[in-house]
């Protein structure tokens, strides 16, 4: 959905943005809010964005509807089993890639946020039937909560027409982005940020070593 909205001119706030905005404090803000330690300034958090997508913001659609009275809600629906498979892969990726490097500040905060999201999604149990039931219950809740004039129930196979009609946007002259690149995108982003943050952590030590070497060579 993020790719489709981008082609329509919308800049979406995604989990990726929360991680990228670590130095602005986004991960800490989300953790504090999800752990009931502080309120969230939605207007400030999303000041540079036109839309929100993905976790953790998707949990708080009611709060965002209150903060943005003119906002519309797009509920993307898919086969529950396909969603479960995708979610399980994402959890495995996180456990493989992020858990071992949580000593890096950005990834320690991300690991905490991921566990907070996991708690809200799974409700304390990652049992297949339990989690799928919660997924279905969430979709039913959104349909029952959001006024019909503000809600689009959307499947990727529906293509551009219903989405563009709902948003009042022209239909792009290109295929709808059907591919699910979430896992690949997360993997690529994580690896890049790991390298960047490790360099930042190591730089003072490398600089100090360079000074020592220079001093020794000048003796």
List PLM regions with ranges.
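Short His-Asn-centered micro-motif
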Residues: 16, 53-57, 77-78, 156
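Soluble or luminal CAZymes and related metallo-dependent hydrolases
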Residues: 37, 41-44, 53-56, 130-138
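PAPS-dependent sulfotransferase catalytic domain
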Residues: 85-150, 154
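Juxtamembrane amphipathic/hinge helix adjacent to a transmembrane helix
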Residues: 161-197
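PAPS-dependent sulfotransferase catalytic core
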Residues: 1-42, 47
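Conserved phosphate-donor/acceptor-positioning beta-strand/loop module used by diverse small-molecule
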Residues: 64-89, 163
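Terminal signal-anchor or tail-anchor transmembrane helices
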Residues: 194-219
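PAPS/PAP-binding and catalytic site of the sulfotransferase fold
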Residues: 1-5, 65, 86-88, 154-171
């Amino acid at each position: 959905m993020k790719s489709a909205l981008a082609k329509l001119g919308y800049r979406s706030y995604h989990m990726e943005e929360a991680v990228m905005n670590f130095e602005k404090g986004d991960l800490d803000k989300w953790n504090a809010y999800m752990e009931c330690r502080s309120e969230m300034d939605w207007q400030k958090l999303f000041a540079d964005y036109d839309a929100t997508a993905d976790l953790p913001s998707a949990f708080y659609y009611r709060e965002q509807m209150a903060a943005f009275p003119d906002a519309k809600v797009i509920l993307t629906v898919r086969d529950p089993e396909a969603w479960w498979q995708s979610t399980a892969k994402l959890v495995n990726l996180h456990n493989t890639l992020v858990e071992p490097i949580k000593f890096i500040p950005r990834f320690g905060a991300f690991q905490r946020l991921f566990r907070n999201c996991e708690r809200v999604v799974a409700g304390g149990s990652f049992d297949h039937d339990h989690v799928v039931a919660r997924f279905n219950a969430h979709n039913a809740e959104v349909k029952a909560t959001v006024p019909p004039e503000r809600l689009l129930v959307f499947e990727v196979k529906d293509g551009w027409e219903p989405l563009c009609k709902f948003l009042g946007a022209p239909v792009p002259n290109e295929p709808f982005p059907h591919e699910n690149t979430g896992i690949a995108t997360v993997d690529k982003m994580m690896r890049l940020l790991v390298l960047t943050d490790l360099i930042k952590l190591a730089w003072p030590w490398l600089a100090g070593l360079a000074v020592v070497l220079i001093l020794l060579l000048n003796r």
